[in-house]
A protein has these predicted regions:
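N-terminal catalytic or cofactor-binding beta/alpha core of small enzyme domains
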Residues: 1-131, 135-137, 148-149, 155-159, ...
């Protein structure tokens, strides 16, 4: 069973859920209720922030999609997807310090592809680096649209995101070349998104430059990035020039310890 979570506090989330219910007959239940066992997926409504739902492992879902608005300081409209977790000692937006959730790399790759196919609106399409809560052992991903008020409330954009989730749940398996983790780059890791869309790299977790403490003091988190994922990680991808030499050395040392090779981009 697959869970699809939406929050009544989030208009984009509501619009996506309503689309799935109206167009594809998804069953909706309230948080704490049971899904019909005959269905492949169901929608769960919550009155809480999606970032606070650390208790969802109790449902024993095989996978969880979070339908969410996207926030952008620059107001850039975008379709995005990302895993959850906190790389640092801070956990201001849910989850716990120095804890990553289990990621869903193939589903995130599939969502990016669905966005690209349906994006007739000129919105940005991107991964976001791993950030915020909730903290879960169940593999999960956020599927988002927004960046500004118009994009958040746009029902045509919600249709794109809703249809992407539907297609990933009910259509064929995602083809990919390799499952990887990403190190460096920015919160919107353009190079990683391009590798996903052009070469089929399925990113599990992404550690952006700004979340690296000091000159690599928290590279121990790479072990979680490799182990906490639905699919086995084969290699790391490092945005070489975004890291200084001391940080690169610590990253490579940790990757060697984990027995993981790397590519420079």
């Amino acid at each position: 069973m697959i869970g699809v979570l939406y929050s009544i506090l989030d208009i984009a989330s509501v619009n996506m859920a309503e689309y799935l219910e109206r167009e594809h007959g998804f069953e909706e239940i309230d948080e704490g209720s049971a899904c019909a066992s005959s269905r492949k997926a169901c929608i769960i409504k919550t009155s809480k922030s999606l970032l606070e739902l650390d208790e969802l492992d109790k449902y024993n879902f095989e996978l969880i999609y979070f339908l969410s608005k996207h926030s952008s300081a620059k107001g850039i409209a975008a379709f995005t997807t990302h895993p959850t977790g906190n790389w640092t000692k801070e956990a201001k937006l849910g989850g716990k310090p120095y804890e990553l959730s289990y990621s869903a790399p193939l589903e995130m790759l599939g969502i990016l592809r669905e966005f690209k196919k349906a994006n007739n609106y000129g919105l940005e399409i991107s991964y976001e680096a791993t950030h915020h809560g909730p903290l879960l052992k169940t593999p999960s991903l956020f599927v988002e649209v927004g960046g500004n008020n118009d994009a958040v409330s746009n029902k045509e954009y919600a249709k794109v995101t809703g249809e992407a989730v539907y297609n990933l749940i009910y259509n064929d398996d995602v083809e990919f070349s390799k499952v990887v983790i990403g190190i460096g780059n920015t919160h919107y890791p353009t190079k990683f998104s391009e590798l996903a869309l052009n070469k089929g790299y399925a990113f599990a977790h992404m550690l952006p430059k700004h979340a690296i403490e000091g000159n690599g003091d928290n590279v121990f988190m790479l072990e979680q990035a490799v182990k906490r994922t639905k699919n086995e990680v084969e290699i790391a991808v490092i945005d070489w020039k975004s890291l200084n030499s001391e940080t690169r050395a610590k990253v490579i040392s940790k990757l060697n310890e984990l027995g993981l090779d790397y590519e420079r981009v």
